[in-house]
Amino acid sequence: MSEFKLTTVEEFEEATARLLETGAKVGADAWQFRVKNQTPHCKFGEQGVCCRICAMGPCRITPKAPRGICGCDVHGIVGRNFLKFTAAGAATHSDHGREICHTLYCAKDGGNYQVKDPEKLIRIAKEWGVETEGKDIYDLAHEMAETGLMEYGKPFGYQRFLDRMPAGQKEKLIENEIAPRAIDREVSTSLHMAHMGCSSLPEALVKQSIRCGMADGWGGSMMGTEFSDVLFGTPKPIDTEANLGVMVEENVNIVVHGHDPSLSEMICEYADSKEMIDYAKSVGAKGITVSGVCCTSNEVAMRRGVPMAGNFLQQENVVLTGACEAIVVDVQCIFPALGPLSKCFHTKFITTSPIAQMPDAEFIRFNAETAGENAKAIVKMAIDNFKNRKPELVHIPQLKQKATVGYSVEAIVKVLDSVTNSQVDETGTTKPLLECITSGVIRGAVAMVGCNNPKIRPDYAHIELMKKCIANDIVIIASGCSAQAAAKAGLMDKSAKDLCGAGLKRVCELADIPPVLHMGSCVDISRMMILAAELAKDSGLQINQLPVVGCAPEWMSEKAVSIGNYVVGTGIDTFLGVDPYASGSSEMCELLTEGTRKWTGAAYTVEKDIDKLVDLMIERIEEKRTALGI
């Protein structure tokens, strides 16, 4: 057996440099060049001190002009911008959940979409107080879909999933006016508060930012996660591979990119069919390879083992290989640059959602009723495009690593059951993990999430932080592009246990797990909140007492701000490697890094130096252990 070895960031960069050489031959643009054209960035924007919410401005705050034309000071301007940032992210993630609810409503026996996990559907229905006895599973699915959709606009009450929190936490959120009500109400209220002539008090703006984020995390995202499991199956550990080397030169290569599993699941279904594989062979290919980018990739990897071609800043690379017949996208994190780039090659750039329409793309409207027909047409289009490849432009970097993915909360509990003495101990709980933490075998956990950002060397922060954490016996749970960075490096290979401290290594060996656990897409950060709640309930603690922190070292999107706010709102300290455009206001900085503790028991830490950031995380975990006397 060959010795296990991580793939380094330097190797990632060498592969990218070679692909950019191909791009130069055809005059292709790439993000590396656009970053240079946009540098330096606007300092007013970076500090959050520019206001353009009315037509009296734009106003920008300087020492000579400390207030906007309306009289709003820097603290109000930064606060409003932060709230609008959050609202856009919460709307986006929650709309994903809404789409999944609609897909669930369209599910039927023998249809395009079916209920793959009826037990989970019944469990959630009982949790919500919906009668299940004697009901056809699809009647129940439709009722639950409608009930879920009501969470977006119900006139009264709070998000149903808040009842999953430990005793007293929901009540504290209500008391502090940060418990989320209807999802759309929180987004609408946020935009109203940020309108000219409304809120300019930083404390009120931060409170609503947390409330809006909580509507995402404990509302839209949680429904998106839970109902995706009902439709497509609850993830369990499955082996896959990651990095550009998963593309196969002799095959038709279809890359799915975006966030909605409704599209990618159907593409995979038809690409796996004998009819389409035979058709691919008839045009000279040996078969069909579907791989993924971003969170769509995470979705199909953890349920089907579909390989991961890369994360956010690798989306152009899959086209630059010259071997991508079609890049099929749904919503979010998609570069508009993919259209012009694809025209430099033979690649078909196919958009499928009216929410994400782009120039230089072929638009095939995808919906639940015609999903099979749409998917088949897309796969056929990719196969027909195989003959248009330009062999002189084909180069697939031979970089890939093995990864074990698919650690849903249910899967983690099952893994814990495997190391439990069922004759003595209770099964179906997180108590074995708690025992490891209490004894000090594992010091704590870090939820590593988020994007890539050209402001930080891509993937470097994710990988280096993870390596140092696991060496210090801190287990990592990861999602989104952070999870893909880990997978590309090899940190989701079970052999990576050899990089751990002695305690975590022993746990990995006993439980047969990698030290970095793949929990899914960015929407699936809701799984992390559920896991934290279960740990708190099983230990008799509140979430903010657990030796657990969150980290988004390379975040870039509005969704990430919403996520950060619901992680802090849940009671988990959150560490950022990129400033959330709040540095221009001392009051906002104080509120975000300390003031929120009085409402949630958690706050942000912003540190751009990666070595300092990881030390601060470890220090915080140890502080929590000391407070618990463990």
Locations of regions flagged by a protein language model:
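Anaerobic metallocofactor- and corrinoid-dependent redox/one-carbon enzyme cores
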Residues: 2-630
